Structures are given as C-alpha cells and as structure tokens.
Amino acid sequence: MSGMFYGTNIPNLDLSSFNTQNVTDMSRMFEDTEYTVKLYLNNFDTRNVQDFTEMFSLSRRYAIDSLTNIYVKNDFNISSVSKQIFNVFKGRRTLRGGNGSKCSFSGYNNEALKCLRIDRPGEAGYFTQI
C-alpha cells in the first residue's frame, strides 16, 4: 500500500472497510494529502506492517496542511517494525489527537512511532478513538 493515496485530496477519506491484515508497507500512504481533513482508518490491522516511513507526511515546505483528525478503533500495532522509520508526521501542523494533544518528537527516528496511538491523558498520540 506504499504511496497508495499519495496526493489524494478527498476531504473525508473513509477507509474503514479496508482489509490490511497482510500489508507490510504503509510508507508514504497518505503523503502530500494537502486537502484531506479527516481520515477514517477504523479497522486498520497493522500487526504485519514493517514500514511506516512518511506515512502521513507533507514533503513540500510550504504545503497546505488541512489534516486535523485520524480516526481509529485501536492503537496501531508497531511490533513488526524492523528498520529505522523516518518522518511519519513530517510537516503536519494542524493534526491533533482526540484530546487535543500534539506529539513532540524529532521526527527523524522511531520516536514518531509512539504517536501512532490514540490520544490519552498522559500518552500523547495523533489518533482519535471512534
């Protein structure tokens, strides 16, 4: 699924019916989705995903950033990640978790993977629970 929705600008992208149980690469899946405001990834099964590099990133410095919410049922399972992951949320300025949190991390290492979770008190994440 690498780059599958690259540059797509559907305001509300609902992928809750996608079967992702055998996917191993979600890198750049939503890169440069400048006008997408909400992503619905309710049933994403990420237990086999090894690469989340630039999954939600904006590659251009002055890109329009409209993404505010990513909706999920569960945290992403990152147990299969087997390499260094970069820039998962690079350039995202408007994205917030369900409790309003903004993750703080360098973005240049696996620290960004910690934000692939539901935003909870004491645990910042970029996801909003459905």
Task: Report residues per predicted region.
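Negatively charged
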Residues: 2-130
